[in-house]
Amino acid sequence: MADYEKQKMNAAIKAAEYVRSGMIVGLGTGTTSYYLINEIGRRVREEGLKIRAVCTSRRTEDLAKQNGIEVIQGTKDQIDLTIDGADQVGMYGTLIKGGGGALLREKIVAYNSKEMYVIVDSRKIEAAHFGSFPLPVEIVPFMHMRTLENLRGICTQTDLRMNEKGEPFVTDNGNYIADMHMGMIDDPINLERSLKSIPGVVEVGLFNGIAKRIFEGTDEGCNIYSITNSGIKKEEVYFDP
C-alpha cells in the first residue's frame, strides 16, 4: 500500500533543494507544503539558509515563524520561487487548488513569482480525469446565495463549503468558498474566464500556465516533471538513498 505521507515528504524535501539563500520564496498552504516549510526550517537552522518568505495563509505564516523563517507581508519585487501543493494536476500542468481554502492568496503569490513548483503525492496527477476533484471558487458573502445560483448555471452540483460547526467556511480574506463538482474539465481556460465573469466571484481555483515543474513524491523518492507546451515531460527520477 502506498504511503502518501511519505510521498508528500519526499516531494517537499526534493523541491526544497531548489531554495537558495537570498531568495524571496512563496510558501503554499496544505499538508504537503507544511513538510516543505519544516524542511526549509531545518536548512535555516542547520545550514544557515537565509530567505524571506511570503506566506499564502495565516497557518503557513505561523508555521514558518515557528521554523525560524523570516516572513514578510508583501514585496514590490517579484518572488523568486513559489513552492505549493495542488489538489489535482491536469495533462498540460493546469492545477486545481483551493482545497485548503487559500486559493486567492495562493494565486496572487504564484502569479507574482518568477517560477512556481508544485509538490504532490502520486494520487494528484490526473491527466485523464482532470476535474474529478471539486473546483473551489472564492466568492464574497454579499448576495452569496445568488452567486451560488449563477455558478449552478454552469455546474448544477455546486455547494457552499461549510466548517465543522455547520457554518459557512470563511477564508483569511473574509470570503466564502463554493465547491463545484464538475466531474471533468475539458477547457480550463474558458471555464475560468466564464466563472470570473460572474459578479461576486473573487477567484477561481484553476491555475492555468503558471506552474513550471511538478515534484511527484513516490514511496522510493520523487519524479520531477517539467511543464511544456506539449504537456508534462519527465525530467528526472530521484531515489531516496
Curated annotation (Swiss-Prot):
The organism's place on the tree of life at top rank: Archaea
Pfam family, one: Rib_5-P_isom_A
Disulfide bonds: none
Single annotated GO MF: ribose-5-phosphate isomerase activity
EC main group: isomerase
Reactions catalysed according to its record: aldehydo-D-ribose 5-phosphate = D-ribulose 5-phosphate
Any one Gene Ontology cellular component term annotated for this protein: cytosol
Pathway: Carbohydrate degradation; pentose phosphate pathway; D-ribose 5-phosphate from D-ribulose 5-phosphate (non-oxidative stage): step 1/1
Entry EC number(s): 5.3.1.6
Residues that coordinate or bind substrate: 29-32, 84-87, 97-100, 124
CDD domains: RPI_A
Keyword Cell wall biogenesis/degradation included in the entry's annotation: no
Active-site residues annotated for this sequence: 106 (proton acceptor)
Keywords from the UniProt entry: Isomerase
InterPro entries noted in UniProt: NagB/RpiA_transferase-like, Ribose5P_isomerase_typA_subgr, Ribose5P_isomerase_type_A
Quaternary structure and partners: Homodimer.
Protein name: Ribose-5-phosphate isomerase A
Organism per entry: Thermoplasma acidophilum (strain ATCC 25905 / DSM 1728 / JCM 9062 / NBRC 15155 / AMRC-C165)
Organism ancestry: Archaea, Methanobacteriati, Thermoplasmatota, Thermoplasmata, Thermoplasmatales
